[in-house]
Regions:
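Conserved beta-propeller blade repeats
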Residues: 1-14, 24-28, 56-86, 113-136, ...
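Alpha-helix-centered segments that form part of catalytic cores
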Residues: 30-55, 69-77
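Beta-propeller blade signature
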Residues: 32-45, 100-109, 147-150, 193-199
Length: 201
């Protein structure tokens, strides 16, 4: 199976991630009941809506905004064994403002929807295993790389002295190393890092 979203809607939100030429028929709806996350059977090609944008808004809206927001899923990924998935949900920002991101997880069939974080600063992420995820996000220690547990309030900075800037993150197959990069520096180079979790260096 595979997960899919409305890439026309994503194109309107963030062209670098969306598909051009695909129109969003729900463009005028902030969080439609007929659109959201779809599950695709890769053998038959059939798809079905498993989580609607209206459902997502209802689990993320509390204490986040004073007004109704138009939202979209920007990133979505299965955990290691495919039993749950995570999605980054973002609002369409007003002119001159930056979008904010909520973290939501669910079972593969769309059940057991859980809001890990309300709308705040959240960037790159990676599943560690079937329960834990890495997120570069705004948390108790400011913007840091955090280890977060699905369906709980557990959040812990990985190494506040090392992960000072946002970057793509991924674990080695044995779970002992983190591969990390950076945004381009002044000479347009991206730095690549490997970090040993046990040795903390």
């Amino acid at each position: 199976v595979a997960l899919a979203i409305n890439f026309g809607r994503l194109m309107d939100f963030r062209p670098v991630c969306g598909y051009s030429g695909v129109k969003d028929k729900f463009k005028d709806y902030n969080h439609p009941e007929e659109d959201g996350v779809f599950l695709i059977d890769m053998k038959t090609g059939k798809s079905k809506l498993i989580v609607s944008y209206d459902q997502i808004w209802n689990v993320t809206k509390e204490n986040s905004f004073t007004e109704d927001q138009k939202i979209t899923v920007n990133h979505i990924t299965f955990n290691k064994n495919g039993t749950r998935f995570v999605m980054l949900v973002r609002n369409f920002p007003s002119k001159g403002e930056r979008w904010r991101t909520a973290i939501v997880t669910a079972n593969t069939d769309g059940s057991d929807l859980y809001c890990l974080s309300g709308y705040t600063y959240v960037s790159h992420y990676s599943w560690k295993d079937d329960e834990y995820l890495l997120f570069y996000m705004d948390g108790p220690y400011g913007k840091q790389l955090y280890l977060v547990s699905d369906k709980s309030s557990f959040i812990k900075p990985v190494d506040p002295d090392f992960f000072l800037e946002d970057g793509h993150c991924s674990y080695s197959p044995d779970g002992e190393w983190i591969l990390y990069d950076s945004y381009p520096d002044t000479e347009n180079y991206r730095n690549l890092y490997i970090y040993n979790i046990r040795k903390r260096k």
